[in-house]
């Protein structure tokens, strides 16, 4: 059984709204989770990290004011410390985050969303 697409979003985020509109327009089912009210668990974050190609840099919002205010050197932190930080301060996560059983899309990226759409379409027609 295929895991449904999970869409971590924040309603006032422009990229999240664009992504949600795109998903609906392409009739892709998803389970939306408010990133700050339903923060990803440690296990979910580990899974998201396992799908990245660039590790933490791919999901960390380094340009955010929250990140800048912390004045941290992520490179010196352990994975567990980073996970705890992301759970405590989910604003440090880039958004939106879309994840299913084998695919991860970060941000509004129509090209990547299209790949996700094609994968879903192929699966549904089989």
Curated annotation (Swiss-Prot):
Induction description: Expression is sigma B-dependent. Induced by ethanol, heat and salt stress. Positively autoregulated.
Keywords assigned by UniProt, alphabetized: Activator, Cytoplasm, Disulfide bond, Redox-active center, Repressor, Stress response, Transcription, Transcription regulation
Effect on the protein of changing residue 55 to R: Loss of activity. Strongly diminishes expression of mgsR and of the MgsR regulon
Keyword Nuclease appears in the UniProt entry: no
Cysteine disulfide partners in this protein: 13-16
Activity regulation remarks: Activity is controlled at multiple levels. Regulation includes a positive autoregulatory loop on mgsR transcription and a post-translational redox-sensitive activation step by an intramolecular disulfide bond formation in response to ethanol stress. In addition, protein stability is strictly controlled by rapid proteolytic degradation by the ClpXP and ClpCP proteases. The McsB protein-arginine kinase might serve as a proteolytic adapter for the ClpX ATPase in the degradation mechanism of MgsR.
Outcome after substituting residue 63 to E: Slight increase in MgsR stability. Strong decrease in activity
Subcellular location: Cytoplasm
Effect of residue 17 to E: Destabilizes MgsR approximately by half. Almost loss of activity
Phenotype upon loss of function: Deletion of the gene results in differential expression of approximately 70 genes in response to ethanol stress compared with the wild-type strain.
GO CC, alphabetical: cytoplasm
Alphabetical list of Pfam families matching this protein: ArsC (PF03960)
Keyword Transcription regulation: yes
Family designation: Belongs to the ArsC family.
Function: Regulates transcription of a subregulon within the general stress response. Exerts positive and negative effects in response to ethanol stress.
Classification via NCBIfam families: arsC_related, PRK01655.1
Protein name per its UniProtKB record: Regulatory protein MgsR
Annotated source species: Bacillus subtilis (strain 168)
Annotated gene: mgsR
